[in-house]
Amino acid sequence: MRHYEIVFLVHPDQSEQVPGMIERYTSAVKDSGGSVHRLEDWGRRQMAYSINKIHKAHYVLMNIECGDQALEELTTNFRYNDAILRNMVIRCDEAVTEESPIQKAEKENRERKNRAERRAAEAAAATETEKSESEESAEEETSTDTTGEEE
């Protein structure tokens, strides 16, 4: 069996059907005795150029190991499925299981946003604490002033 990297683009109006498509294609590979080494759903993204006046598509990446029959079945399914705008199949020398650069970049961006949100929340909490402490000290000063006048 050989290793393949497959990327296919799904019409944006059919995005809700992507999990079903992925399940169908992975089961076709597994039923033929192959295996899926990596599966990444990149989501809806801007395309480099428009296809049939469509500017966005749902991207899916699969790294599989399968025989010729299973690959032929997959490419036939891609060809006759109107929801698939483009597909690309590349033969690889070995199985690729690590995250793709796109997935890594998205993960880093999410982590950066989370860190920035945490910092902002901590800063807001710190300023809130300072305000409450200054209000408490101001109240204490006014209460001591009023008690001093009564005596």
Swiss-Prot record:
It comes from the Bacteria. Keywords: Ribonucleoprotein, Ribosomal protein, RNA-binding, rRNA-binding. Residues 135-151 have a biased composition (Acidic residues). Residues 98-151 are annotated as: Disordered. One of its GO terms (cellular component) is cytosolic small ribosomal subunit. SUPFAM superfamilies: Ribosomal protein S6 (SSF54995). One of its GO terms (biological process) is translation. Pfam families: Ribosomal_S6 (PF01250). Signal peptide: none annotated. One of its GO terms (molecular function) is small ribosomal subunit rRNA binding. PANTHER family: MITOCHONDRIAL 28S RIBOSOMAL PROTEIN S6, SMALL RIBOSOMAL SUBUNIT PROTEIN BS6M. Binds together with bS18 to 16S ribosomal RNA. Belongs to the bacterial ribosomal protein bS6 family. This is Small ribosomal subunit protein bS6. It comes from Teredinibacter turnerae (strain ATCC 39867 / T7901).
